[in-house]
Swiss-Prot record:
This is Ribonuclease J. The gene is rnj. It comes from Mycolicibacterium smegmatis (strain ATCC 700084 / mc(2)155) (Mycobacterium smegmatis). GO terms for biological process: rRNA processing. Belongs to the metallo-beta-lactamase superfamily. RNA-metabolizing metallo-beta-lactamase-like family. Bacterial RNase J subfamily. GO terms for cellular component: cytoplasm.
Amino acid sequence: MSAELAPPPPLAPGGLRVTALGGISEIGRNMTVFEHLGRLLIVDCGVLFPGHDEPGVDLILPDLRHIEDRLDEIEALVVTHAHEDHIGAIPFLLKLRPDIPVVGSKFTIALVREKCREHRLKPKFVEVAERQSSQHGVFECEYFAVNHSIPGCLAVAIHTGAGTVLHTGDIKLDQLPLDGRPTDLPGMSRLGDAGVDLFLCDSTNSEHPGVSPSESEVGPTLHRLIRGAEGRVIVACFASNVDRVQQIIDAAVALGRRVSFVGRSMVRNMGIARELGYLKVDDSDILDIAAAEMMPPDRVVLITTGTQGEPMAALSRMSRGEHRSITLTSGDLIILSSSLIPGNEEAVYGVIDSLSKIGARVVTNAQARVHVSGHAYAGELLFLYNGVRPRNVMPVHGTWRHLRANAALAASTGVPPENIVLAENGVSVDLVAGRASISGAVTVGKMFVDGLITGDVGDATLGERLILSSGFVSITVVVHRGTGRPAGPAHLISRGFSEDPKALEPVAQKVERELEALAADNVTDPTRIAQAVRRTVGKWVGETYRRQPMIVPTVIEI
């Protein structure tokens, strides 16, 4: 879509422009820029983790180049919650302008502060809470409690002269939240009474009918599984899911076990959660990892990171026998208390297989209710639309199928189809005279963090890395100058392809036959010989191993 649109014209006087630099037509790297009267307000600034087709990339950022020449116009960065796909890129934005005010709840600011400390940044923080407001230049922001899978989530209503925009962030309507803080649907409905001109709504689970299960349903399942375990229990979950960790701790303590946190982010986040009063556990019930290893197996529960098969996460290292403190044994119970993020299937199943090989019992959400989503299902989104009654809707936080499903829900509640705007990253949506419409698009791409380098990593570079990930085969042939006939056997070397030294012997014979055929056809040009050798080796490797390694032929004339 964005490639087909012209750049947006100057914003109409008094209008409001909304441009997502990430998070629309994808799930991750959420960042939305609001423009009014020449000033900017940013909501969220997150990262996307690379897929298998982006080797060597550490993180993917929103395209910050769009605002690099307008940094002085930014009034504030409002953060809806502290998940990585909403805060992970904040240090990279602050390196461009360190004094941008960062606005968020107590828990959100605590995690952002730790992240910025790792980058040696000391931002200006503005702490807010639900039922409060803050003024940032021409933008007045009003905050509403939101239930999700991390403490301190907020929806934000942005009041401007052009109208009111309500951004849900990540949202769920859990009616039995463990922290006693349900999504403030009454408050949002009162906002709807006053008039919501544009509603940016979470689309993640818009395809799921009905209502999402409550987080409170997970606790009894965890209690039952831990009670039935005869040995050690290891529960893997997201390091930010404080309510989940609280339920694990409650079950463990009730069953006479003590707990230990494993993984840097888990230790850090739970330390912050305890300090701020979100996680309640006695000191006597917590062990460090060394003490936990000395405990009888049936008296300890380890709470660890690694739910997505991340190679360096604690659970993955345990599965490979590489964790410096924990050695898994047959009889351990491993509970994966998380969802499977699309794209991570191979890594997660690989970890599960490794755990099963050791003899551990692995329980996932497929076998028992050990996880529930933090995003609203379709039935909950209908409640939101009927409560807010927006004039215009812009689905966010989802791929195209999620956005379209969310748009259909909005239409079913009476929002006119012409007032539902389906956009993607880079597309500008202008709110003028109470009507939202697409005005154009700016060019946005992906900003890659690749080691110490931040910027573009082109398709050609990623393509080369993908080829290298399949291995490397070097072929050296010596031919007589003038005739092209082989002067000796072909010499092949492989790296990252096969450990069998004889694996390439059949193709060496094929290369020699190809050289004889070329000489018979009077082909003597070294470049043409090299091309033929590459084709011969590539075809054989593809047919034999279903691999496409990098193939480098060298032709030496004598």
